[in-house]
Design a protein with these regions (language model features):
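An N-terminal boundary/leader segment
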Residues: 1-54
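Short, solvent-exposed turn/loop segments enriched in Gly/Ser/Thr/Pro and often Arg
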Residues: 123-128
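Flexible, acidic active-site loops/lids enriched in D/E/S/T/G that coordinate Mg2+ and/or position polar
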Residues: 49-72, 79, 98, 102, ...
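Enzymes and membrane/adaptor proteins characterized by extended Gly/Ser/Thr/Asp/Glu-rich
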Residues: 39, 71-111
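Short alpha-helical functional segments enriched in proximate histidine and acidic residues
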Residues: 33, 37, 55, 59, ...
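Single conserved hydrophobic/aromatic residue that forms the stacking wall/gate
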Residues: 130-137
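General beta-strand structural signal in soluble alpha/beta enzymes
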Residues: 79, 119-122
């Protein structure tokens, strides 16, 4: 059995579209990998496993409907915690935004979702990454 977590996005997209792998199985494989390494890596700021698996099942059901699919249909994608989402906290790596979310998704999240991607969650970012500060010349 091939380790799907080692495949490129292109290869995963091909396997998802052909039905060789399901979105649910792919998401479960990623969750297993996260469980294995998260204690040491501490990469995730927000990850709702139950919601991820629900969205994966929805993607698989939609795929079976025969309706047109986006190029990233059923593909799990992680985003940094500075990218705004309405259904997940966007804390920007600071306690001042603890559990705050946006009123709408950012443009990149809209593009990903419209392409069929599943937003897995938010990865950790450095505090105030979103700010631009002057530099010395």
């Amino acid at each position: 059995m091939i380790d799907v977590t080692s495949l490129s996005a292109y290869d995963l997209s091909q396997k998802l579209h052909s039905g060789e792998i399901s979105s649910l199985d792919l998401c479960k494989a990623y969750l297993d990998r996260i469980k294995k390494f998260e204690k040491d890596v501490q990469a995730w700021q927000f990850l709702d496993k139950k919601l991820l698996l629900e969205k994966a099942e929805e993607a698989d059901t939609y795929r079976k409907s025969g309706k047109p699919l986006g190029p990233l249909h059923g593909m799990p994608v992680a985003i940094k915690d500075i990218i705004g989402t309405y259904d997940m906290p966007t804390e920007c790596g600071t306690v001042f935004r603890k559990k705050m979310s946006n009123s709408q998704d950012s443009e990149i999240v809209n593009l990903l979702k419209n392409s069929g991607a599943i937003i897995m969650g938010k990865t950790v970012t450095v505090s105030y990454t979103h700010l631009t500060l002057p530099t010395k010349a």
